[in-house]
């Protein structure tokens, strides 16, 4: 598998300079897609123009709360999120990997989704990992572009709870410590019973 990271330096051993150029082009495309999808100030019209053309008919979206499939379902869901919520995204790392033969690949984006629903009070930072599985198709002009077949959004309920003012302190300082001690005690008892 050939890879590139946000540093722009290849991490694999590309056999041709064209591979690295393709990976860097894909990296920029997925950076743009992420920033469009995860900035709710972007109007639905722009999503239709700049995101939808990169979605396969069978595209699926999965996060810890929901799963949906189909380009039209994805398009309506993205537009709905942009209407109902307020957030943006800070990208910390972005990596594109191509499978052998360069017909498909995966982009992984690591960052923070800044939930701004109550921005006058608090911007909620939610560590998020995005995974885009894609195939590559040739355009009539000979260029290659990705078609996203699966978009998965991953974040931790623990991180979500820890970021809530007040509740986060109780969760982090009391519950997590208490659970850790309880788990270690249960482990010791289990080991003692099995000996």
Go through each PLM region and give its residues:
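Terminal "cap-and-tail" regions of soluble proteins that handle hydrophobic small molecules
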Residues: 2-42, 135-195
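Amphipathic alpha-helical protein-protein interaction segments
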Residues: 12-19, 63-70, 118-121
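Calcium-regulated, polybasic anionic-phospholipid
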Residues: 45
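A solvent-exposed, acidic/Ser-Thr-rich amphipathic alpha-helical stretch
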Residues: 48-109
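Short, low-complexity, polar/charged sequence segments that are solvent-exposed and flexible
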Residues: 80-81, 127-131, 168-174
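Short, cysteine-centered beta-strand-loop-beta hairpins and adjacent loop/turn segments enriched
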Residues: 83-88, 114-125, 157-166
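Glycine-rich loops and low-complexity Gly/Arg-rich segments
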Residues: 85-88, 117, 132-136, 174-178
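Exposed beta-sheet edge and beta->alpha loop/turn motif
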Residues: 106-145, 149-155
């Amino acid at each position: 598998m050939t890879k590139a990271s946000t540093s722009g330096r290849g991490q694999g051993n590309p056999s041709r300079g064209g591979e690295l150029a393709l990976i860097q082009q894909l990296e920029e495309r997925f950076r743009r897609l992420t920033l469009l999808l995860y900035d709710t100030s972007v109007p639905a019209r722009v999503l239709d123009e700049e995101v939808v053309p990169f979605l396969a008919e069978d595209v699926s979206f999965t996060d810890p709360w929901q799963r949906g499939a189909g380009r039209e379902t994805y398009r309506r869901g993205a537009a709905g999120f942009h209407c109902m919520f307020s957030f943006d995204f800070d990208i910390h790392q972005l990596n594109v990997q191509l499978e052998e033969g360069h017909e498909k690949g995966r982009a992984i984006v690591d960052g923070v989704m800044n939930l701004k629903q109550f921005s006058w009070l608090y911007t909620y930072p939610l560590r998020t990992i995005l995974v885009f599985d894609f195939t590559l198709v040739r355009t009539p002009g000979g260029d290659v572009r990705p078609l996203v077949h699966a978009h998965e959004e991953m974040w931790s309920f623990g991180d979500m709870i820890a970021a809530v003012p007040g509740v986060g302190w109780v969760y982090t300082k009391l519950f997590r410590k208490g659970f850790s001690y309880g788990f270690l005690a249960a482990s010791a008892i289990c080991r003692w019973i099995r000996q």
